[in-house]
């Protein structure tokens, strides 16, 4: 039993051991030079006796062992040369067995045994069997481990495998396998026994030291994996059962985990696939404290890579029913290991799903089965709070999205939304964003109402308002990014069949209406434009389609009216007004005058009742005027009503400059530059004159309040309108009108500057330059400008 001591004591004992080896090695080398066999055996035995110490930790003992190992290599060279020691190798093999102590005797016997096998004077299997049996005489765990490690090392190149020099009638591959298996079994027993050395108070230190020695045991499995001639049949019938028997029976957490890891890594993937049932059965028999999920994950990764290596091997997976066996094994492990945390179970499901997607991507039923098993496990937990487990669930849900380029495939998985239901609000949003990003990345088009229903159920975390407390904590930038993503998603929903597209719009609308006041301003506009696009599609196909359930422009406009009306209660009147005007223009294109008039009515009501901000009013009136100017569906009465309203509101804006610009913008309502457009030159002139009066009043107010009339920009803008309508052929706009306005602007500029410098306004200068250019250009237009004097 190794006594407990400090690091300083161990260093001292190690130094003493090394000194002893060096001292005896010196005399051994002197005897080697003299070819004195008796002295060589004497001092080599004394040198190897230093390895009998029990005072050193495994790491220190390894340092001592390596010093002795270097000397043993020199000794082996001496034993090979019979001319130097004068004894046949058979006699030498007998002679070294007379060494006084068993540990030096066994090291010498292994060294001579290596030479004996190489001489081929006896079948290698007999010598190997003799050595592996006699090594049982050393039962101290650390000393025995290093002795058997030495035996494995000196015999590695002397195994009777196929193609080796030692293969023959008396020697077979099975003999080599039997030797390695027997040595492995004994080494594993010694390794496991180390934990029982010393008091239990230093168990953690002992486990660490045992972990450092694991490679000595694992090398045997590595050798087994490299022996030429171990075919699938031998592996299935002999190698794997013997190894797994030792793994299961040792009942040691560290040994079971490490040896299962070795088995998976050192043997071929094809062998794993053909012996999958046996391997998985062993996994379910491991100690509950063994981290089985890592073992199974490594196995599935190996098999997945094997499947990806060549399409020709995929039929093998179907033949052995790999998915069913893995699924059953994982279910048993999760059910039996009651202490396994939820993150462990989720990790196993992620690995199984990854395996399924790589090996059986076409079997959606397998994918759904994995998700279903995940739902069952999650349902057994009151609430999923483990962040690591949540991360694994996200990985589970992300895997189908990454595998299938078409998101529609994932939407057919019935258990997918059931898994998402177990996520918390924050993670649910993260997953919903991943789904939307996947759709954008693959440019997928969701084309049926049923699939849209499933999709919006999946992303409901982004669509519905959170609790008030959570809503306040939400970062505004993140919130906007989420809602913009939903808006982009709505544009990806499309179907060439109008009836199905209308169903999609209704499904989306039903979900979006639950969004609350913060979300609607982001999500309603894309829905409106999607519906307007459908209206224009119907119009291009010939208008209304018969049938009560058919998609018709009138029906769609009714839905749009109800949808936009919700925005007014948010409140978000400016956005609602813009959308009403868009719908009015679409109704005009469909030649639906009453519908277009109703949308304009709603827009004017919003302007009157909801929009109070002066800047918003200016923007709104220009939008109304611009839209009304483009619409040609109205009859005389309706158009007069709407234009009268627009010009009236324009003249009642708060600021005089805003009034002026809105009024001269209204002039375009009476002159539409289309063959069939209205051309009322008289009313155009009235608007421009009214704008001129307002501009004049603005100049006077500026002069009264600031002492100067200020810039003449408004007059120049009105001048440009005169020039526009003059060139368009309005008979009521004459050269004299333009001439008078130019003179007015010059006078205003002179009075403001107090001198005779004119044309200091760049806009006015550019306007005059344009008139001059047209005059010089000549032609009909040039002649029209001739009366104007600059």
Swiss-Prot record:
Subcellular location: Cytoplasm; Endosome membrane; Prevacuolar compartment membrane; Golgi apparatus, trans-Golgi network membrane
Pfam families attached to this UniProt entry: Vps35
One Gene Ontology CC term in the entry: endosome membrane
Membrane topology summary: Peripheral membrane protein
Disulfide bonds: none
Entry keywords, A to Z: Cytoplasm, Endosome, Golgi apparatus, Membrane, Protein transport, Transport
Top-rank taxon: Eukaryota
SUPFAM superfamilies: ARM repeat (SSF48371)
Tissue occurrence: Expressed in siliques and maturing seeds (at protein level).
InterPro entries (alphabetical): ARM-type_fold, Vps35, Vps35_C
Biological process annotations from GO: protein transport; retrograde transport, endosome to Golgi
Family membership noted in the UniProt record: Belongs to the VPS35 family.
Function: Plays a role in vesicular protein sorting. Component of the membrane-associated retromer complex which is essential in endosome-to-Golgi retrograde transport. Also involved in the efficient sorting of seed storage proteins globulin 12S and albumin 2S. The VPS29-VPS26-VPS35 subcomplex may be involved in recycling of specific cargos from endosome to the plasma membrane.
Quaternary structure and partners: Component of the retromer complex which consists of VPS29 (MAG1), VPS26 (VPS26A or VPS26B), VPS35 (VPS35A or VPS35B or VPS35C), VPS5/17 (SNX1 or SNX2A or SNX2B). Component of a retromer subcomplex consisting of VPS29 (MAG1), VPS26 (VPS26A or VPS26B), VPS35 (VPS35A or VPS35B or VPS35C).
Protein name, UniProt field: Vacuolar protein sorting-associated protein 35B
């Amino acid at each position: 039993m190794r006594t407990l001591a400090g690091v300083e004591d161990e260093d001292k004992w190690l130094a003493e051991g090394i000194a002893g080896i060096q001292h005896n090695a010196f005399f051994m080398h002197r005897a080697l030079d003299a070819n004195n066999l008796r002295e060589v055996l004497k001092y080599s035995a004394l040198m190897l006796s230093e390895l009998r110490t029990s005072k050193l930790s495994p790491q220190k003992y390894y340092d001592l062992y390596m010093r002795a190992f270097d000397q043993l290599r020199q000794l082996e060279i001496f034993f090979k040369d019979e001319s130097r020691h004068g004894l046949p190798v058979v006699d030498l093999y007998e002679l070294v067995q007379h060494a006084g102590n068993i540990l030096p005797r066994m090291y010498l016997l292994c060294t001579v045994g290596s030479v004996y096998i190489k001489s081929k004077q006896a079948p290698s299997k007999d010598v190997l069997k003799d050595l592996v049996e006699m090594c049982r005489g050393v039962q101290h765990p650390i000393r025995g481990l290093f002795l058997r490690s030495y035996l494995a090392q000196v015999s590695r190149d002397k195994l009777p495998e196929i193609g080796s020099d030692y293969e023959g009638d008396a020697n077979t591959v099975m003999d080599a396998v039997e030797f390695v298996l027997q040595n492995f079994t004994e080494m594993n027993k010694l390794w496991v026994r180390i934990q029982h050395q010393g008091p239990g108070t230093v168990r953690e230190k002992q486990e660490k030291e045992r972990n450092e020695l694991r490679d000595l045991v694992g090398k045997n499995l590595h050798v087994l994996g490299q022996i030429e001639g171990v075919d699938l049949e031998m592996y299935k019938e002999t190698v794997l059962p013997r190894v797994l028997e030792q793994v299961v029976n040792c009942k040691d957490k560290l040994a079971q985990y490490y040896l299962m890891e070795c088995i998976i890594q050192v043997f071929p993937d094809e062998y794993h696939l053909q012996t999958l049932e046996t391997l998985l059965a062993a996994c379910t028999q491991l100690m509950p404290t063994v981290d089985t999920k890592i073992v199974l994950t490594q196995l599935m990764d190996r098999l997945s890579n094997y499947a990806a290596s060549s399409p020709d091997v995929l039929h093998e997976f179907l033949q052995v029913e790999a998915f069913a066996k893995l699924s059953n094994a994982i279910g048993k492990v999760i059910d039996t290991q009651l202490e396994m945390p939820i993150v462990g179970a989720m990790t196993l499901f992620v690995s199984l799903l990854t395996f399924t997607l790589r090996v059986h991507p076409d079997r959606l039923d397998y994918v759904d089965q994995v998700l279903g098993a995940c739902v069952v496990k999650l349902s057994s937990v009151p609430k999923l709070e483990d962040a690591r487990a949540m991360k694994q669930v996200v990985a589970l849900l992300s895997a189908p999205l990454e595998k299938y380029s078409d998101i529609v495939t994932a939407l057919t998985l019935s258990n997918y939304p059931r898994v998402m239901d177990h996520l918390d609000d924050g993670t649910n949003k993260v997953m919903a964003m991943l789904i939307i990003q996947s759709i954008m990345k693959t440019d997928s088009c969701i084309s049926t109402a049923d699939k849209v229903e499933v999709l919006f159920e999946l992303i409901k975390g982004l669509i519905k308002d959170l609790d008030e407390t959570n809503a306040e904590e939400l970062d505004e930038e993140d919130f906007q990014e989420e809602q913009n993503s939903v808006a982009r998603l709505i544009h990806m929903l499309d179907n060439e069949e109008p009836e199905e597209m209308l169903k999609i719009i209704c499904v989306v609308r039903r979900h979006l209406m639950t969004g609350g006041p913060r979300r609607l301003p982001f999500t309603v506009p894309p829905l409106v434009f999607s519906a307007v696009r459908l209206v224009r599609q119907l119009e291009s196909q010939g208008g209304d389609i018969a049938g009560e359930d058919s998609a018709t422009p009138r029906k769609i406009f009714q839905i749009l009216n109800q949808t936009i009306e919700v925005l007014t209660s948010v409140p978000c009147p400016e956005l609602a007004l813009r959308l009403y005007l868009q719908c009015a223009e679409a109704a005009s294109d469909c030649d639906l005058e009453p519908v277009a008039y109703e949308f304009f009515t709603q827009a004017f009501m919003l302007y009157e009742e909801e929009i109070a901000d002066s800047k918003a009013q200016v923007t709104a009136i220009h939008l109304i005027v611009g839209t009304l100017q483009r619409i040609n569906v109205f009859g005389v009465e309706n158009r007069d009503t709407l234009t009268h309203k627009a010009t009236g509101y324009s003249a009642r804006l708060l600021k005089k400059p805003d009034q002026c610009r809105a009024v001269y913008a209204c002039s375009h309502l009476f002159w539409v530059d289309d063959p069939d457009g209205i051309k009322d030159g008289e009313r155009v002139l009235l608007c421009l004159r009214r704008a001129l009066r307002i501009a004049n009043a603005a100049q006077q107010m500026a002069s009264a309040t600031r002492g100067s009339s200020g810039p003449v920009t408004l007059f120049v803008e009105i001048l440009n309108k005169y020039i526009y309508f003059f060139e368009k052929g309005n008979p009521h706009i004459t050269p004299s009108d333009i001439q008078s306005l130019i003179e007015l602007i010059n006078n205003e500029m002179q009075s403001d500057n107090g001198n005779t410098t004119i044309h200091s306004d760049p806009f006015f200068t550019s306007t005059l330059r344009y008139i001059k250019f047209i005059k010089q250009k000549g032609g009909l237009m040039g002649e029209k400008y001739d009366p104007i004097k600059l």
